[in-house]
């Protein structure tokens, strides 16, 4: 008993590893697309922990792909330049001046910071934008009216991604995309991650957010819905109980699962090691969406 008390912390750590074993076995060799954004991009400690999670996922046999946003950083730069940020249904209104800032921040700064941190932590990452290798082809999105250089993805060149994965690299993708009209388009990072996951028929699509997941009551943090099948997710989408940036998140999760992604997750990126907790533990921490009803496991 004394011995157990003395090594209590070590035993607890061992139990965590034991709990993770079936998930490591289950997901080894599978592809997981992670949309990285929100507060986890601004807090240096959180940023490091997210990248540690991603490197660990790679080391235990998963194939993580990072698609990143940059909303907070873009907002800060626009504010510094005296340009007002405007949104329609969670999508940034993007005129020509804003598009230049978006591309500069996403591809020139954030993408390279993520790549550098992954490499520092022992991983091997390559950073690209949707324009590189014609990775993400887009056209103007008019579903919310004319909101400028906002695009919707019409094609994903998976050869670029699979080439990196086959060589053991972690792809880090900025969602700025090209159009056949020669223009650059700003594509919502959640949507881009969803389209990439669909094209690859990924095991999982995981969206890091600044909320606990999907709440049945937006004003009650304890009302987290931990699991939803497609029918429930669609009903919730049409209920009017979500707004703002959660709209494209839930929408892209629904489309991803409809188009071959096994599970889509919306999780709180503000929590320490949230990715590992969602993937490798029995309970998970956020909302998981699948095609059909779930058994009592997280697989």
UniProtKB/Swiss-Prot annotation:
Q: Which SUPFAM superfamilies match?
A: Carbamate kinase-like
**Which pathway does the database say it acts in?**
Amino-acid biosynthesis; L-arginine biosynthesis; N(2)-acetyl-L-ornithine from L-glutamate: step 2/4
GO MF annotations, alphabetized: acetylglutamate kinase activity; ATP binding
Sorted keywords for this record are: Amino-acid biosynthesis, Arginine biosynthesis, ATP-binding, Cytoplasm, Kinase, Nucleotide-binding, Transferase
> What biological process terms from GO does the record include?
arginine biosynthetic process via ornithine; L-arginine biosynthetic process
What residues bind substrate, as annotated? 70-71, 92, 186
Signal peptide as annotated in the record: none
The site annotation (Transition state stabilizer) covers 35, 249
What is the designated name of this protein?
Acetylglutamate kinase
């Amino acid at each position: 008993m004394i011995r157990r008390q003395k090594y209590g912390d070590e035993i607890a750590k061992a139990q965590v590893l034991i709990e993770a074993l079936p998930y490591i076995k289950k997901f080894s060799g599978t592809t997981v697309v992670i949309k990285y954004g929100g507060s986890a991009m601004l807090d240096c400690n959180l940023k490091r922990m997210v990248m540690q999670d991603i490197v660990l996922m790679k080391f235990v046999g998963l194939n993580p792909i990072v698609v990143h946003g940059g909303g907070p950083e873009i907002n800060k730069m626009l504010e510094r330049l005296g340009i007002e940020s405007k949104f329609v249904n969670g999508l940034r209104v993007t005129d020509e001046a804003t598009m230049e800032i978006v591309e500069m921040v996403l591809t020139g700064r954030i993408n390279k910071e993520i790549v550098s941190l992954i490499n520092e932590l022992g991983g091997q990452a390559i950073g690209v934008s949707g324009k590189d290798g014609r990775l993400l082809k887009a056209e103007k999105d008019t579903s919310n009216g004319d909101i400028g250089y906002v695009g919707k993805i019409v094609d994903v060149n998976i050869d670029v991604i699979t080439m990196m994965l086959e060589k053991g690299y972690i792809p880090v993708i900025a969602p700025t995309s090209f159009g056949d009209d020669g223009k650059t388009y700003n594509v919502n990072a959640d949507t881009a991650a969803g389209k990439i996951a669909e094209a690859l028929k990924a095991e999982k699509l995981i969206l890091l957010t600044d909320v606990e997941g999907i709440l049945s009551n937006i004003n009650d943090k304890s009302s987290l819905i931990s699991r939803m099948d497609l029918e429930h997710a669609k009903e919730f989408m049409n209920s009017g109980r979500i707004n703002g940036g959660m709209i494209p998140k839930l929408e892209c999760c629904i489309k991803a699962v409809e188009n071959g992604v096994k599970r889509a997750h919306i999780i709180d990126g503000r929590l320490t090691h949230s990715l590992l907790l969602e993937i490798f533990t029995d309970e998970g921490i956020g909302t998981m969406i699948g095609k059909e009803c779930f058994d009592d496991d997280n697989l």
